[in-house]
A protein has these predicted regions:
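Short glycine/serine/threonine-biased micro-segments
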Residues: 8, 31, 57, 127, ...
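Short glycine/proline-enriched turns and hinge-like loops at secondary-structure junctions
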Residues: 6-10, 34, 54, 191
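A glycine-rich, basic-preceded beta-loop-alpha segment at the flavin cofactor/substrate interface
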Residues: 26, 31, 36-99, 120
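A short core secondary-structure module
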Residues: 1-24
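Alpha-helical interface subdomain recognition
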Residues: 68-206
């Protein structure tokens, strides 16, 4: 039974075979036309006791521990790395990048390196058997905002590039993909608003 004073107590995890009666799976197609996510609905689905994963009643703790692996991975900060790399090469071809452009790119790359270090530190803590829930949430919050802002900056800088510059078409294609995926960055794996709540709770602020 759920303890009213401990609202997360009593949850358990189950392994759910997707071919069970009552399970319906519908594709969620992205704006880019790609398919990475599904909507799953359950209608009177029965799960055997043998399908319990881990400890009965410890589902919430297990899920939050698992999410530390998901939220802190390098994919949370490196989605736009191919775009940034291609853009830097194109700008270098022009040989006329001003101080503002150089400073903007330098700031972005410094943030990327810092985020990578933060991601690696969380991975190290996980490997040592710790559960850095707050740190992992912070990596995803900062990382996904970095990804969105890097697309915006890339679009701004790219607007000044001559269409005849070598590599122009590749950057244009990567930028188009980045624009379509950008809204998704702060949604997948938990919205940033939820993540900030996790961090605030971990710091004793709520």
């Amino acid at each position: 039974p759920v303890d009213p004073d401990r609202r997360h107590a009593g949850f358990s995890q189950f392994i759910v075979p997707t071919d069970l009666p009552g399970i319906s799976i519908s594709s969620i197609v992205l704006m880019s036309g790609e398919h990475h996510f599904n909507e799953v609905t359950f209608d009177e689905v029965f799960i055997e006791d043998d399908n319990v994963l881990g400890e009965i009643g410890a589902g919430w703790q297990q899920v939050t521990a698992e999410l530390s692996f998901e939220r802190s991975g390098p994919e949370r900060i490196l989605t736009t790395a191919p775009l940034l790399t291609a853009l830097i090469r194109v700008l270098a071809e022009q040989h006329d990048a001003d101080d503002h452009t150089a400073a903007a790119l330098g700031d972005l790359l410094a943030r990327l390196i810092s985020l990578r270090q933060l991601s690696v530190s969380v991975a190290r803590a996980l490997a040592d058997g710790h559960s850095p829930v707050n740190e992992a949430a912070l990596v995803k919050d900062l990382g996904t905002r970095f990804e969105q802002e890097s697309v915006e900056l890339a679009a701004d800088l790219f607007s000044y590039v001559d269409t005849q510059t070598p590599g122009y078409d590749r950057v244009a294609a990567l930028l188009e993909v980045g624009r379509l995926h950008s809204p998704l960055f702060t949604l997948r794996g938990g919205t940033n608003e939820v993540l900030r709540g996790v961090v605030a709770r971990g710091m004793g602020l709520r």
